[in-house]
Amino acid sequence: MLPPKIFFEKVKEIMWPIERKELKLFIPMALMMLCILFNFGALRSIKDSLVVPSMGAEIISFLKLWLVLPSCVIFTVLYVKLSNNLNFEYIFYIIVGSFLLFFLLFAYIIYPNQDIYHPNDEMINKLIASYPNFKWFIKIGSQWSYALMYIFAELWSAVVINLMFWQFANHIFDTSKAKRFYPVLGMVGNIGLIIAGSVLVFFSSGQDVIDSELLPDSFNSSAGNAIMLQPIMSIIVTAGIIAMLLFRIINRFILTDSINVLDAKKVTAKMKTKLSVIESIKLVIHSKYIGRIALLIICYGLLINIVEGPWKAKIKELHPNTIDYVNFMGRFNIWMGISCVTFMIIGSNILRRLGWLISALLTPIMLSITGLMFFIFIIFIEEIGECFGDFNLLYAAIIVGAIQNILSKSSKYSLFDSTKEMAYIPLSLELRTKGKAAVEVIGTKFGKSLGAFIQSLIFIIIPTATFDSIIIYLLITFIVMMSLWIWNVIKLNKEYVELCK
């Protein structure tokens, strides 16, 4: 048996591998990530609660393919242009500030006056009757402000988290520090999901946080939705401003005198390396290593998109209005945050003790197991119902899907993100900066958009198709892409080990 002092040192090494002298940098970085992930959790729930009850879960595939993906491409071009003329600090303020301004405009101007901006239902119904194959595009046009909010909420994940925050972290941490810092950063940051879920539940439950049945009937109107939405958006904007202030503090007062990180001036100078848009794209295409990182992101995005569509369709059946949907997603966020923090504690030690390959393989393995369970439950729901009698099968299907989502995303946030970010570190600063911009923004959304393309093509050709009717085809696609993901991780590991030598 170990002496108490050594035992507690071992526990500290497992739970908190951050040294005291590193806290000056770690604490503001962790708080910044907490604020950014709080916004991510809240925005993810709000965007779905707006579009799914009003237009149907099938609309998500059209939004991701026809609106989100082009927006990502446009943003990537703008980002490369900005990076050639401004340093990273100012780019961060411009981008995050633009997001926060839009969220305020949506909550206080666009959403409360949506009846003025949106076309009337009679005209929309006539158009759908005349052009049934284009009914989903017509629905997007009928609720265009919701679609715009969906785009900005999706871009928050791709741009502010994957590109801005992690690129900043990659510039100031080397590989050895990343192994200790990244999992713990994620653990602290994911507390933001728990806080976001609690905020959503509070404002969507009227005056009671726990019992959603006390929700007043008046809240089922668009006015009630606005009453719920405005304070949530105000908190989101406040969290964004705090993140910007923390970023300022890190750049101005911490990086300039820290002996544990790269020199801030050198980083800024290198990040302004001139590179055209075409040259950036060529750089990524000609780099096999960057291509493999992109394939990781594409596989994850496609698989999550394939599973989430049928799950969100089931949620709409149980919670057909916006406020009930927000309430459910708030509770989902709470459990997601708890699971993520737990996985972060486990993941931190897996990454440090078992290495990159095992850590990178655990996410596809977790997703394959839970995803197959969900598909089997949906496909054989009638047979399962015969075994359980009067049990609420719709509720059970939603819970199985929620468990799948929570476990697969927890492993993604704790292990996938950390291993993916570590894969960038051995690269040159030029390839890391410009290549990451293209891979993170375009790659992230291309994966989801590829899954969306498969689904939307079916919905266009067969207007009466639903997720229930195409579930078997989604299962086949799921199995093929999962196999490709696992193969790609093994190949990428060989190149990563070589670069780290």
From Swiss-Prot:
It comes from the Bacteria. It is found in: Cell membrane. The keyword ATP-binding applies. Pfam families: TLC. Keywords: ATP-binding, Cell membrane, Membrane, Nucleotide-binding, Transmembrane, Transmembrane helix, Transport. The chain crosses the membrane at residues 23-43, 59-79, 90-110, 146-166, 183-203, 227-247, 293-313, 326-346, 361-381, 387-407, 446-466, 470-490. Coiled coil: none annotated. The keyword Transit peptide does not apply. GO terms for cellular component: plasma membrane. It is a multi-pass membrane protein. GO terms for molecular function: ATP binding; ATP:ADP antiporter activity. Belongs to the ADP/ATP translocase tlc family. Provides the rickettsial cell with host ATP in exchange for rickettsial ADP. This is an obligate exchange system. This energy acquiring activity is an important component of rickettsial parasitism. This is ADP,ATP carrier protein 3. It comes from Rickettsia conorii (strain ATCC VR-613 / Malish 7).
